[in-house]
A protein has these predicted regions:
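N-terminal secretion-targeting helices of virulence/extracellular proteins
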Residues: 1-80
Length: 80
């Protein structure tokens, strides 16, 4: 494997790791959102803020997963 292909593949691994971290963050935010909803005491703006961050984490995780897949394919082509 060329050094360039190895570097590209390494970036893909980092992006996928970041995507997993964001997915885990979204899961934690979902749990927080459920507890806030069940408690019924949190102001609507707090639930909305938590939900906005949850949605952002999900979107970012999807984007990073897509970027990692593109980098993996690019690394494969760079190896040839």
């Amino acid at each position: 494997m060329s050094a360039e292909a190895a570097a590209i593949a390494a970036h893909a691994v980092v992006l996928q790791s970041d995507a997993r971290a964001l997915t885990e963050c979204a899961e934690r935010l979902h749990e927080i959102e459920a507890r806030l909803e069940a408690g019924g005491l949190a102001p609507p703006w707090l639930r909305e803020a938590v939900n906005a961050h949850l949605v952002a984490c999900v979107a970012a995780a999807a984007d990073l997963t897509t970027a990692a897949a593109h980098l993996r394919r690019y690394a494969e082509r760079a190896r040839s």
